Amino acid sequence: ELNVFGNKYNITKDGLNEFYENYKKHVFENNKEAYIVERQLDNGKIAIDLDFRYNSSITEKQHTNDHISDFIELCMNGFNDLFLEMNNKPISFYIFEKENVNCLDNVTKDGIHIIINIIADFSTKLLFRKYILENIEDIWAELPLENDWNSVVDEAVMKGNAGWQLYGSRKP
């Protein structure tokens, strides 16, 4: 038994950096486990949760680094198409994925979490998601997915309705 209990915290913007520093020390320096889920903020960085579902006979990752590069290019095209002015600021993509797929009895799960250093409100994030959905099949049609694109590109995270596991945290 893990002896892990749920709780809810409201960390102010002023305290967020201190929280992240303490979290980093706890997880990455002291090698301790954490089980933290956070909500995406309105006027926060763009977070994209890509959930892949495959037939249970699949036991290895189906996407490659080329798929990820193509997705980043799709996003950059979306920024250029949707937003008039990006102020020539550098755009960073932080890509997070597990090393292996998760093989269950009836489905194989995989996915990618992406954080982009662009601040946007929820309505802008949803507009960006719509752009992704309209174009993603052009780059990833060959992936043998069992789920549709609407469920691949998780809407709840971009609306702020779902938790996002903090990097380094795990499920209990």
What do the PLM-derived regions correspond to, one by one?
Residues 148-172:
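Structured partner-binding subdomains within large eukaryotic complex subunits
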Residues 1-147, 164, 170:
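Signature for HUH/AEP ssDNA processing cores
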